Amino acid sequence: MKKNMKLNFMLMSGVLLFGMYSCTPGAQDYSSYVNPFIGTGGHGHTYPGAVVPNGMIQPSPDTRIYQWDACSGYYYADSTMNGFSHTHLNGTGCGDYGDVLLMPTVGKQDYHAMGEESQQMAYASAFSHDNEVAQPGYYSVFLDRYQVKAELTATKRAAIHRYTCLLYTSDAADE
């Protein structure tokens, strides 16, 4: 009888453990809850670019150059993109770094000096938030002026840009 009780106990324990194991929820991807656009308007001074934890580089779009709302380089209310730079400070409240901008262009560009009142570079492009995607480690936007899809991602120490030109004309090649 004692042997029977031990066997029943072991059997019930095994069934219980198996039942508990099969009820364990699968791993969740909590990054789907992240909205990188939070704080990019008002005075949040954040940016939506591609960032990894403890990364040395933060590739992100730059829509403004001067003034208070341009502290992080990006301001959600803007509809013009000046380019993409690699170092940004989140929530600073003061200007940062003075980055070199990268901007994919098509065709001949006219460069001219601009005054401090302008928030747009000569080669800036319009964009729509409808064609903008930001998620942890990835940023993408469609540049209307050049018909280019720009994609940015980051590792701990490097950024990767991919530019896809959707419109190719012989005029662009000739200029």
What are these regions (language model features)?
Residues 11-19:
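Bacterial N-terminal signal peptides
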Residues 26-170:
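Accessory carbohydrate-recognition regions in carbohydrate-active enzymes
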Residues 171-175:
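A short, hydrophobic C-terminal helix/tail in secreted or cell-surface proteins
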